[in-house]
Amino acid sequence: MSNAINQNGTGLEQQVAGLDLNGGSADYSGPITSKTSTNSVTGGVYVPPHLRGGGGNNNAADAESQGQGQGQGQGFDSRSGNPRQETRDPQQSRGGGGEYRRGGGGGGRGFNRQSGDYGYGSGGGGRRGGGGRFEDNYNGGEFDSRRGGDWNRSGGGGGGGRGFGRGPSYRGGGGGSGSNLNEQTAEDGQAQQQQQPRNDRWQEPERPAGFDGSEGGQSAGGNRSYNNRGERGGGGYNSRWKEGGGSNVDYTKLGARDERLEVELFGVGNTGINFDKYEDIPVEATGQNVPPNITSFDDVQLTEIIRNNVALARYDKPTPVQKHAIPIIINGRDLMACAQTGSGKTAAFLVPILNQMYELGHVPPPQSTRQYSRRKQYPLGLVLAPTRELATQIFEEAKKFAYRSRMRPAVLYGGNNTSEQMRELDRGCHLIVATPGRLEDMITRGKVGLENIRFLVLDEADRMLDMGFEPQIRRIVEQLNMPPTGQRQTLMFSATFPKQIQELASDFLSNYIFLAVGRVGSTSENITQTILWVYEPDKRSYLLDLLSSIRDGPEYTKDSLTLIFVETKKGADSLEEFLYQCNHPVTSIHGDRTQKEREEALRCFRSGDCPILVATAVAARGLDIPHVKHVINFDLPSDVEEYVHRIGRTGRMGNLGVATSFFNEKNRNICSDLLELLIETKQEIPSFMEDMSSDRGHGGAKRAGRGGGGRYGGGFGSRDYRQSSGGGGGGRSGPPPRSGGSGSGGGGGSYRSNGNSYGGNSGGGGYYGGGAGGGSYGGSYGGGSASHSSNAPDWWAQ
């Protein structure tokens, strides 16, 4: 039955309008008719339950002088104010409305009876809150504020909005009344906010200030602080910014605990059964005033947040790269770190960087002529990675060390929904992990500014240059308003650092420390490497036999994962289909897969649902997948550095692993380098490799892409080239020659860039640096007397 007014009777709203539901007396006690209900009954207008709450005023006369309040959005389409009054004078009151289960509206455009002046309304409550002036679209809510009047004269701030953090969602409270053209109107707005509703049966119990934004106060709208969602109002329940985000806030303070998130981040720990073997790995740090290394995390001053998260991550003691890198970074020095894969490089730079960011706290946006937009983020830290998978992995680690803090990490990579990543940026970020292409795109869109960068990390730097990212990296570092070298702290991490990379680093690093952990460019002795001669047509049969032996082996468990590498995308799809037809639980990953498919494949592989993963090189670099017991090189790569990274997926963090490679005539180009690697890691040497290497040596073939003096003598980044001694008979000035086959001799030269001098290696005949001199590893494999280019003890060649 309709409640509308009709000629023969009264509607339900009219019948209840004169009732005093609060125990008082109605303003009008006579019979309620259609003639008296709208004009005569001024004090008892019935407010339906879904319209009761924060902003609506039950007294129409008061609302006329004070303006409509802040609609609080209690789960319905709430529009404050009386619609009949609004039609009488559309200029008189504009109460903000809220959408279903979203934030309430802003304070209305009020009319003052005494002065006859109209006040300007506040910003409407946007999605999950909002309010205030246009740029303050985060105050009390998430985003998307609607502008209401001149921001200098804005009315009440937006409603508190629902909290967007984890945990239950609660209705937000009303914002403050703000300022108006007339002081009396502002005072009326404050009185209105404090006024109790006439009908309190729907009133909710009080909550503490800051719990859900209900105590936003007068200054909830109009907050202009950078990244400050809730410094003086607003902020949703369980929001990291609910206690404020301004310069007066202690960012080192440990936040509230979230047990569900804690299990999600730290639920699985794997320290490795052979971790103590790392204690004997030699470490070399070169540079000026190198800080002393630490032996435990207690030896360095860390914030309470970092200590708590390190304990949750089950990091009982630092790895060798962490022992040296953490004190170097905390002391503000630039660093080039070269460590074997799986040695904890990610935590080595995340722990000290986030620790310094917590101590640094709030950094205001840069001063510029243009008006600052809250939609543009100015992070303090930037981590560049070559692949989407590595960027995602670093981001997951960053979330661990940012747990219970006010700092928010974000990840940017190509192949995913751009708008989704932009929404994540709009929520705020202090540390960005990104691939170079997508970061440049976001900078072009005006979503990210680099003016506040204090910490820059290039992870897997050699891989990024191999993939052709050097122009983009140079634009990001040198041309897009990033603070110059010396004003920011720059770190480069990778498992390999050829000399060309070290020379490039001189443009990005200032007075850096070179850190070499373990045999540079080598692989772990925890990995048992087996090389099998397999003709190309027989590879699939050998693979089936190998997988069957793994599955039937005594050490096989359901958590034992097998990673198979192939060279081409087509080969990955073909091999996956073949193994699937042979009833093996298998999935695959390569560059033509969508990001969603790649993430799903990695999830199935990590969980053990598909314990066999066929992959191209896209998954070879940096991915930390626990429990990979066996790596199979179905197709060997063309260079030994790629081989090192592939087999580095197993034997991580001290665990034992197995790597099996299929070798045939097609892999002759990698034979000599691979033989060196096997000798170095004390592996069994197949006779066919010795014969093939011997044939190549006597043939005088030129080694492509390598300097004279052999793999470890000239071009692999085994030493800090700033300490190499220049000179030598017949040497030339400029970059060292890249040729140098069997029997080639002659001294190195010198290279100088930006004040950093790199002396070339003296001598260096033959493949292994034999003869007179021969570079860093000269004499290790070649005959004759070798003189090393450094005066320090050369434990690399021992």
From Swiss-Prot:
Which residues lie in Basic and acidic residues bias regions? 198-209
Q: In which tissues is it expressed?
A: Vas and bel colocalize in nuage (perinuclear, electron-dense granules in germline cells) and at the oocyte posterior during oogenesis.
Bias category Polar residues: which stretches? 31-42
Q: Which CDD domains match?
A: DEADc_DDX3 (cd18051), SF2_C_DEAD (cd18787)
Region (Disordered) residue spans? 16-248, 689-765, 778-798
Q: What is its EC number?
A: 3.6.4.13
Q: Where is the composition biased (Gly residues)?
A: 94-110, 118-132, 154-178, 706-717, 740-750
Please tell me which top-level EC class this enzyme sits in. Answer: hydrolase
| Residues found modified as Phosphoserine | S177, S179, S214, S219, S638
Null mutant phenotype: Flies are recessive lethal with a larval growth defect phenotype. Hypomorphic bel mutants are male-sterile due to defects in spermatogenesis and female sterile as oogenesis usually arrests around stages 8-9 and egg chambers completely degenerate.
Q: Which domain of life is it from?
A: Eukaryota
Q: Where are the transmembrane segments?
A: none
- InterPro entries of this UniProt entry? DEAD/DEAH_box_helicase_dom, Helicase_ATP-bd, Helicase_C-like, P-loop_NTPase, RNA-helicase_DEAD-box_CS, RNA_helicase_DEAD_Q_motif
Q: Where is the Helicase C-terminal domain?
A: 542-693
SUPFAM superfamilies, per database record:
P-loop containing nucleoside triphosphate hydrolases (SSF52540)
Please tell me which stretches of this chain the record labels as motif Q motif.
295-323
Its keywords, alphabetically, are: ATP-binding, Cytoplasm, Developmental protein, Differentiation, Helicase, Hydrolase, Nucleotide-binding, Oogenesis, Phosphoprotein, RNA-binding, RNA-mediated gene silencing, Spermatogenesis
As for what it does, the entry says:
ATP-dependent RNA helicase that is essential and required for cellular function, larval growth, and for male and female fertility. Also required for RNA interference (RNAi), double-stranded RNA induces potent and specific gene silencing, by acting downstream of dsRNA internalization. RNAi is mediated by the RNA-induced silencing complex (RISC), a sequence-specific, multicomponent nuclease that destroys or silences messenger RNAs homologous to the silencing trigger.
User: Which family does the UniProt entry place this protein in?
Assistant: Belongs to the DEAD box helicase family. DDX3/DED1 subfamily.
From the Swiss-Prot or TrEMBL record, give the protein name: ATP-dependent RNA helicase bel
Q: Which organism is it from?
A: Drosophila melanogaster
Identify the coding gene: bel
